[in-house]
Swiss-Prot record:
Keywords: Acetylation, Endosome, Host-virus interaction, Membrane, Transmembrane, Transmembrane helix, Transport. It comes from the Eukaryota. The keyword Repeat does not apply. Expressed in hypocotyls, roots, lateral roots, lateral root caps, columella cells, leaves, shoot apex, stems and flowers. Its main location: membrane. The modification N-acetylalanine is found at residue 2. It is a multi-pass membrane protein. One of its GO terms (biological process) is vesicle-mediated transport. Belongs to the PRA1 family. It comes from Arabidopsis thaliana. This is PRA1 family protein D. One of its GO terms (cellular component) is cytoplasm. The keyword Cytoplasm does not apply.
Length: 182
Protein backbone atom coordinates (compact mmCIF):
# COMPACT_ATOMS: atom_id res chain seq x y z
CA UNK A 1 0.00 0.00 0.00
CA UNK A 2 2.74 2.46 0.95
CA UNK A 3 4.68 1.63 -2.22
CA UNK A 4 1.58 2.34 -4.32
CA UNK A 5 1.13 5.71 -2.62
CA UNK A 6 4.76 6.68 -3.15
CA UNK A 7 4.68 5.46 -6.75
CA UNK A 8 1.47 7.39 -7.42
CA UNK A 9 2.90 10.58 -5.94
CA UNK A 10 6.11 10.15 -7.95
CA UNK A 11 4.20 9.62 -11.19
CA UNK A 12 2.02 12.65 -10.55
CA UNK A 13 5.03 14.82 -9.72
CA UNK A 14 6.84 13.64 -12.84
CA UNK A 15 3.85 14.33 -15.05
CA UNK A 16 3.46 17.82 -13.57
CA UNK A 17 7.13 18.70 -13.93
CA UNK A 18 7.18 17.10 -17.39
CA UNK A 19 4.33 19.38 -18.47
CA UNK A 20 6.25 22.48 -17.37
CA UNK A 21 7.88 24.56 -20.07
CA UNK A 22 11.69 24.69 -20.07
CA UNK A 23 12.92 26.99 -17.33
CA UNK A 24 15.47 28.45 -19.74
CA UNK A 25 12.61 29.71 -21.91
CA UNK A 26 10.74 30.94 -18.85
CA UNK A 27 13.73 32.95 -17.59
CA UNK A 28 15.17 34.02 -20.96
CA UNK A 29 16.30 37.59 -20.25
CA UNK A 30 16.47 38.48 -23.94
CA UNK A 31 12.70 37.93 -24.19
CA UNK A 32 11.91 40.64 -21.64
CA UNK A 33 10.83 44.08 -22.80
CA UNK A 34 8.27 46.69 -21.90
CA UNK A 35 4.94 46.27 -23.67
CA UNK A 36 4.08 49.00 -26.15
CA UNK A 37 0.53 49.46 -24.89
CA UNK A 38 -1.97 48.17 -22.37
CA UNK A 39 -3.48 45.97 -25.07
CA UNK A 40 -0.04 44.48 -25.74
CA UNK A 41 0.47 43.89 -22.01
CA UNK A 42 -2.93 42.21 -21.76
CA UNK A 43 -2.13 39.98 -24.72
CA UNK A 44 1.24 39.07 -23.24
CA UNK A 45 -0.30 38.23 -19.87
CA UNK A 46 -2.94 36.03 -21.49
CA UNK A 47 -0.49 34.21 -23.73
CA UNK A 48 2.20 33.79 -21.08
CA UNK A 49 -0.26 32.58 -18.44
CA UNK A 50 -1.51 30.00 -20.92
CA UNK A 51 1.95 28.97 -22.11
CA UNK A 52 3.71 28.89 -18.73
CA UNK A 53 0.77 27.91 -16.48
CA UNK A 54 2.56 24.89 -14.98
CA UNK A 55 5.71 26.92 -14.30
CA UNK A 56 3.64 29.60 -12.57
CA UNK A 57 1.83 26.95 -10.51
CA UNK A 58 5.13 25.40 -9.43
CA UNK A 59 6.48 28.79 -8.35
CA UNK A 60 3.35 29.60 -6.33
CA UNK A 61 3.45 26.16 -4.70
CA UNK A 62 7.09 26.59 -3.71
CA UNK A 63 6.39 30.06 -2.30
CA UNK A 64 3.46 28.73 -0.30
CA UNK A 65 5.58 25.84 0.97
CA UNK A 66 8.32 28.22 2.07
CA UNK A 67 5.73 30.29 3.89
CA UNK A 68 4.50 27.27 5.82
CA UNK A 69 7.96 26.04 6.77
CA UNK A 70 8.03 28.22 9.88
CA UNK A 71 4.96 26.49 11.35
CA UNK A 72 5.43 22.71 11.73
CA UNK A 73 1.76 22.13 12.54
CA UNK A 74 0.83 23.91 9.31
CA UNK A 75 3.19 21.67 7.37
CA UNK A 76 1.59 18.56 8.86
CA UNK A 77 -1.90 19.90 8.19
CA UNK A 78 -1.07 20.70 4.60
CA UNK A 79 0.57 17.34 4.02
CA UNK A 80 -2.72 15.82 5.15
CA UNK A 81 -4.72 18.22 2.98
CA UNK A 82 -2.41 17.56 0.03
CA UNK A 83 -2.88 13.83 0.43
CA UNK A 84 -6.64 14.33 0.60
CA UNK A 85 -6.51 16.32 -2.64
CA UNK A 86 -4.33 13.67 -4.24
CA UNK A 87 -6.45 10.66 -3.30
CA UNK A 88 -9.90 12.21 -3.47
CA UNK A 89 -9.47 14.35 -6.56
CA UNK A 90 -6.35 13.90 -8.69
CA UNK A 91 -5.53 10.19 -8.45
CA UNK A 92 -9.06 8.86 -8.95
CA UNK A 93 -10.03 7.40 -12.27
CA UNK A 94 -13.58 6.51 -11.30
CA UNK A 95 -16.25 8.54 -9.49
CA UNK A 96 -16.06 8.76 -5.71
CA UNK A 97 -18.66 6.50 -4.12
CA UNK A 98 -19.54 6.63 -0.42
CA UNK A 99 -22.18 4.28 1.02
CA UNK A 100 -23.42 3.53 -2.48
CA UNK A 101 -23.84 7.20 -3.42
CA UNK A 102 -21.77 8.64 -6.25
CA UNK A 103 -20.40 12.07 -5.41
CA UNK A 104 -19.82 14.58 -8.21
CA UNK A 105 -16.28 15.91 -8.73
CA UNK A 106 -17.52 19.47 -8.24
CA UNK A 107 -18.80 18.63 -4.77
CA UNK A 108 -15.52 16.90 -3.93
CA UNK A 109 -13.59 19.97 -5.10
CA UNK A 110 -15.76 22.34 -3.03
CA UNK A 111 -15.32 20.16 0.06
CA UNK A 112 -11.56 19.99 -0.46
CA UNK A 113 -11.36 23.76 -0.94
CA UNK A 114 -13.29 24.13 2.31
CA UNK A 115 -10.87 21.74 4.01
CA UNK A 116 -7.93 23.73 2.66
CA UNK A 117 -9.36 27.04 3.90
CA UNK A 118 -10.24 25.46 7.24
CA UNK A 119 -6.66 24.23 7.59
CA UNK A 120 -5.33 27.69 6.83
CA UNK A 121 -7.56 29.25 9.47
CA UNK A 122 -7.05 26.64 12.21
CA UNK A 123 -3.27 26.59 11.86
CA UNK A 124 -3.11 30.38 12.01
CA UNK A 125 -1.25 30.90 8.74
CA UNK A 126 -4.13 32.16 6.61
CA UNK A 127 -2.95 35.78 6.54
CA UNK A 128 0.64 34.80 5.81
CA UNK A 129 -0.48 32.40 3.07
CA UNK A 130 -2.86 34.96 1.57
CA UNK A 131 -0.11 37.59 1.54
CA UNK A 132 2.34 35.17 -0.05
CA UNK A 133 -0.09 34.09 -2.75
CA UNK A 134 -1.04 37.71 -3.44
CA UNK A 135 2.60 38.73 -3.73
CA UNK A 136 3.35 35.69 -5.88
CA UNK A 137 0.46 36.42 -8.24
CA UNK A 138 1.61 40.04 -8.54
CA UNK A 139 5.17 38.98 -9.43
CA UNK A 140 3.92 36.35 -11.90
CA UNK A 141 1.62 38.83 -13.65
CA UNK A 142 4.53 41.27 -13.83
CA UNK A 143 6.64 38.50 -15.40
CA UNK A 144 3.85 37.65 -17.82
CA UNK A 145 3.45 41.30 -18.85
CA UNK A 146 7.17 41.91 -19.37
CA UNK A 147 8.06 38.67 -21.13
CA UNK A 148 7.60 38.96 -24.87
CA UNK A 149 5.59 36.31 -26.67
CA UNK A 150 7.28 36.42 -30.08
CA UNK A 151 9.36 33.31 -29.42
CA UNK A 152 6.57 31.19 -27.98
CA UNK A 153 5.41 28.28 -30.08
CA UNK A 154 1.67 27.97 -29.77
CA UNK A 155 -0.50 25.14 -30.97
CA UNK A 156 -4.20 25.55 -31.66
CA UNK A 157 -4.88 22.93 -29.01
CA UNK A 158 -2.98 24.97 -26.46
CA UNK A 159 -4.79 28.19 -27.27
CA UNK A 160 -7.66 29.11 -24.98
CA UNK A 161 -9.71 29.52 -28.17
CA UNK A 162 -8.78 26.04 -29.42
CA UNK A 163 -10.36 24.96 -32.69
CA UNK A 164 -11.95 28.37 -33.34
CA UNK A 165 -8.59 29.48 -34.74
CA UNK A 166 -8.20 26.46 -36.97
CA UNK A 167 -8.38 27.12 -40.70
CA UNK A 168 -8.45 23.47 -41.67
CA UNK A 169 -12.11 22.81 -41.07
CA UNK A 170 -13.91 19.82 -42.47
CA UNK A 171 -14.69 21.20 -45.91
CA UNK A 172 -15.90 24.58 -44.73
CA UNK A 173 -14.23 27.92 -45.11
CA UNK A 174 -12.37 28.08 -41.77
CA UNK A 175 -13.61 30.82 -39.46
CA UNK A 176 -16.53 31.74 -41.70
CA UNK A 177 -18.13 28.37 -41.13
CA UNK A 178 -20.53 26.44 -43.28
CA UNK A 179 -23.56 28.64 -43.76
CA UNK A 180 -26.64 27.75 -45.68
CA UNK A 181 -29.22 30.10 -47.07
CA UNK A 182 -32.57 30.52 -45.43
Amino acid sequence: MANQVITGIKETAQSITGAARPWGDFLDLSAFSFPSSIADATTRVTQNLTHFRINYSIILSILLGLTLITRPIAILAFIAVGLAWFFLYFAREEPLTIFGFTIDDGIVAVLLIGLSIGSLVTTGVWLRALTTVGFGVLVLILHAALRGTDDLVSDDLESPYGPMLSTSGGGNDGARGDYSGI
